[in-house]
């Protein structure tokens, strides 16, 4: 589950289904390549995130894969 703020921002772009698979598919439709990294426990504690999404030269830190995909989508959509 992603935060309500991200859900409302995505809805503004016409994305209303906010589960991990739907968000991943929406991101894949808009970007050619990306990398999702699940961080080990010590970097997760240090950076206070569990996932890191890399798109080009940008980086998005998140607590869940779905949140990472949502942040990436919002960055791509502007």
Predicted region positions:
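N-terminal segment of the canonical double-stranded RNA-binding domain
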Residues: 1-63, 67, 74, 78
């Amino acid at each position: 589950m992603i935060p309500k703020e991200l859900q409302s921002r995505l809805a503004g772009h016409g994305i209303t289904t906010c589960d991990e698979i739907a968000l991943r598919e929406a991101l894949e439709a808009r970007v050619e390549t990306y990398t999702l990294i699940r961080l080990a426990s010590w970097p997760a504690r240090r950076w206070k995130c569990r996932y890191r999404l890399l798109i080009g030269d940008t980086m998005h830190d998140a607590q869940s894969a779905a949140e990472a995909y949502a942040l990436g989508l919002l960055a791509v959509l502007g």
